[in-house]
């Protein structure tokens, strides 16, 4: 765990009208909560998209023919950088607004809480966390619960296991 302040630059863009969507300030708060104590500085982008763009990206990068709630694209350091140079670029998150809204309604969660959860979840993926097996999934879900609790948000997995 790192201590001290986090230097954070979160660029938020919207590919659809912003009415009813979280503000850039909210996304920054959720990303900062996920990074707290883990890294000291980071640059990342959050893009909120419609279903068409979400489906296109999910198809192109994952071979899936549907839009998913969040996609994480970790940054890769360019080849040839001198040793010792560290780039704070963490990566990009793509969040599909219609999928998030549908899931929140189906799961009986507030829209803001679901956006917060998916932003934290995606940010943890950028840090290298995954849920490919049960042990990884349990560890990642527990960390998400702790981060969201610090934000005053209920356990997003309550009732699932």
Curated annotation (Swiss-Prot):
The keyword Methyltransferase does not apply. It holds the Pfam family YbeY. Its cofactor is Zn(2+). Signal peptide: none annotated. PROSITE patterns: UPF0054. InterPro entries: MetalPrtase_cat_dom_sf_prd (IPR023091), YbeY (IPR002036), YbeY_CS (IPR020549). One of its GO terms (biological process) is rRNA processing. One of its GO terms (cellular component) is cytoplasm. Gene3D superfamilies: Metalloproteases ('zincins'), catalytic domain (3.40.390.30). Its EC number is 3.1.-.-. Keywords: Cytoplasm, Endonuclease, Hydrolase, Metal-binding, Nuclease, Ribosome biogenesis, rRNA processing, Zinc. Coiled coil: none annotated. Binds 1 zinc ion. Zn(2+) binds at residues 121, 125, 131. The keyword Cytoplasm applies. It is an enzyme of class 3 (hydrolase). SUPFAM superfamilies: Metalloproteases ('zincins'), catalytic domain (SSF55486). It is found in: Cytoplasm. It comes from the Bacteria. One of its GO terms (molecular function) is RNA endonuclease activity. Belongs to the endoribonuclease YbeY family. Single strand-specific metallo-endoribonuclease involved in late-stage 70S ribosome quality control and in maturation of the 3' terminus of the 16S rRNA. This is Endoribonuclease YbeY. It comes from Xanthomonas axonopodis pv. citri (strain 306). The gene is ybeY.
